[in-house]
Amino acid sequence: METPSNPLLRITDIAAAAELAHSSAGKRTVVAVDNTFCSPILQQPLSLDADLVIASDTKFLNGHSDVIGGSVVAANQQDVDLIAFHANMMGLTASPLDSWLTLRGLRTLGVRMQAHCANAARMVEILQSHQAVTAVYWPG
């Protein structure tokens, strides 16, 4: 699931979705959350019983628009091992430079997300008071 969703920023209750998915009988149901929009600063899906967290590192995590990459974080070692095996076999691992560039961006992630949220809140104020704007989609 992607929450907030793109483009309407609809919110899914991750914990409720995970509870429903994990309570189903039969095969294991994996709950995966695309956390690109929120980053780990604003939302921690593993703490809400998601099994996998997926993100586009190109966006907020990197912060400098100089890396193309993504990440998958798993809640249990079995999933970590399975993902690592397939990523290694298929050559889907990041280069050392891309890894370093992403780590560089992570140093300022908290400050940048704080600024993004403040700027977005101000834009919402402006747009909601503008007579030509009929709807503002804002989960905050």
Predicted region positions:
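Conserved PLP-enzyme active-site core in the AAT-like
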Residues: 1-132, 137
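Conserved PLP cofactor-binding pocket of PLP-dependent enzymes
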Residues: 140
